[in-house]
Amino acid sequence: VYCSEDKTVQGLGGKDEVTGQMSPKNMLTTTICDELRLNSNFKSKVIGIAIKDRGSILPAGHSANAAYWYDGKSGNFITSTYYMNTLPNWVNDFNNRKVTDSLYKLNWNTSLDKSVYLNYATADIKDYESKPFGKEQLGFPYDLTRYVGKDFSKISSTPYGNTLTAEMAKAALIAEQLGKGNATDFLAISFSSPDYIGHAFGPNSWEMVDDYVKVQNLALQKKKQETIAKWSK
């Protein structure tokens, strides 16, 4: 049994209703988000966001207003009928932006001088790496443009998966007006790409180091003041 599998619900936003049959039904305890909702008499708003379904669903708890996760088949953030009957307009608008394709066009190269990676990681190319971008792409730089409009799943194994998650979180923050009511809201964000990258390349890889370098420069942090200005209107 998969931790967040739920065949009693239907997926929303993916290629079909089977994709996205997920919920917190199998979780046998409450979370901090559940306790927050209970304490506020369900006035607090709770939303979970992640690339992985379990990274979005489980932290947000049983009583979340929504949980959204990434569907690598469609390139959309999706949810299930456990939370709602239709996707909100703002989620459809976000999906229509095709953020994944925009990020693919940036390709993936190192952010710092190669000497930095030599200090913190092993050699750039190791036999045990799973080569998620094909056997012909061994080590930096990685050409991601080949996946534009074709394979939306590869984003998860790059630092741009973090950027995609952050952009979705920003959209939720603004559209749902989180933090503007009298009750405390909770936006549960999980960054899944470090796990994908670690499994694909190893914890001491150049890719892992570069992922954490890029995490520090996320658009969510760079545009903090811009986000707050939009949100506070």
Protein language model annotation of sequence segments:
Residues A171, A175, M208, L220-K223:
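A cross-kingdom marker for long, charged
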Residues F186-S190:
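Structural motif
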Residues V1-N182, S192-D195, H199:
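His/Asp/Glu-rich, glycine-adjacent segments
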Residues K214-K233:
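Metal-dependent active-site segment of extracytoplasmic phospho-/sulfohydrolases and closely related
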